[in-house]
């Protein structure tokens, strides 16, 4: 099993002082910064463009940036985020006319590529593109807004995705996003996830280190 990665979502950060807040959460022990990109077309919200990603790099953030594209179409914006400093770029299969091509484009731009599955979306989109996938991201809420509750059916889906990944033999991360918090992260990890997006569960607390330490303790109980 890969080392667990904690990826706070800046959707829940203090946007008025984003650089400071991101640095603080990294200092507290986060591994990756998760970047929710919404276009008010594919999902009913509008968030961040490549300029914000570039601004974090210019500020001095060196941690991996995990860009989750909730936009349609996707191909136009992929090179812009790669140039702005993204390390991972993931998208929803139904938002691309040519999934294989979009995955290859991400890799051609020097980033790790991934597919994102909404709660009711089947995993069958993976069948013919596993060789081009570095990350499988399962949404455990319906995308668009932070602060929602974890959808329990995601646990079974995580188990299915873990089986697919393990049997493929490829080096693929299994990420989960939505409603992840201290009191459910252990069962989420036990179902097979190794990368965890948490927004309000971390940024909504006054002491980031305390909550990340609590998360690490829960994760250690799974791998023990």
From Swiss-Prot:
Its cofactor is a divalent metal cation. One of its GO terms (biological process) is carbohydrate metabolic process. GO terms for molecular function: D-ribulose-phosphate 3-epimerase activity; metal ion binding. Substrate binds at residues 9, 68, 144-147, 177-179, 199-200. Keywords: Carbohydrate metabolism, Isomerase, Metal-binding. GO terms for cellular component: cytosol. Its EC number is 5.1.3.1. CDD domains: RPE (cd00429). The active site is at residues 36, 177. Binds 1 divalent metal cation per subunit. Pfam families: Ribul_P_3_epim. The keyword Metal-binding applies. A divalent metal cation binds at residues 34, 36, 68, 177. Pathway: Carbohydrate degradation. NCBIfam families: PRK05581.1-4 (NF004076), rpe (TIGR01163). This is Ribulose-phosphate 3-epimerase. It comes from Haemophilus influenzae (strain ATCC 51907 / DSM 11121 / KW20 / Rd).
């Amino acid at each position: 099993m890969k080392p667990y990665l904690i990826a706070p979502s800046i959707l829940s950060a203090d946007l008025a002082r984003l650089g400071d807040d991101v640095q603080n959460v990294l200092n507290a022990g986060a591994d990756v910064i998760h970047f929710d990109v919404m276009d008010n077309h594919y999902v009913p919200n509008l968030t961040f463009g490549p300029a914000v990603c570039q601004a974090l790099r210019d500020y001095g953030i060196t941690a991996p940036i995990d860009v989750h594209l909730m936009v349609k179409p996707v191909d136009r914006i992929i090179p812009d985020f790669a140039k702005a400093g993204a390390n991972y770029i993931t998208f929803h299969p139904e938002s691309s006319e040519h999934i294989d091509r979009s995955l290859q484009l991400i890799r051609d731009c020097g980033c790790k590529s991934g597919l994102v599955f909404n709660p009711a979306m089947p995993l069958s989109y993976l069948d013919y593109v596993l060789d081009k996938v570095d990350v499988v991201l399962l949404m455990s809420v319906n995308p668009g807004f932070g602060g929602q509750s974890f959808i329990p059916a995601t646990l079974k889906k995580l188990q299915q995705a873990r089986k697919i990944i393990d049997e493929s033999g490829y080096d693929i991360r299994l990420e989960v996003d939505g409603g992840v918090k201290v009191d459910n992260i252990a069962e989420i990890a036990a179902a097979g996830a190794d990368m965890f997006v948490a927004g309000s569960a971390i940024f909504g607390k006054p002491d980031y280190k305390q909550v990340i330490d609590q998360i690490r303790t829960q994760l250690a109980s799974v791998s023990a």
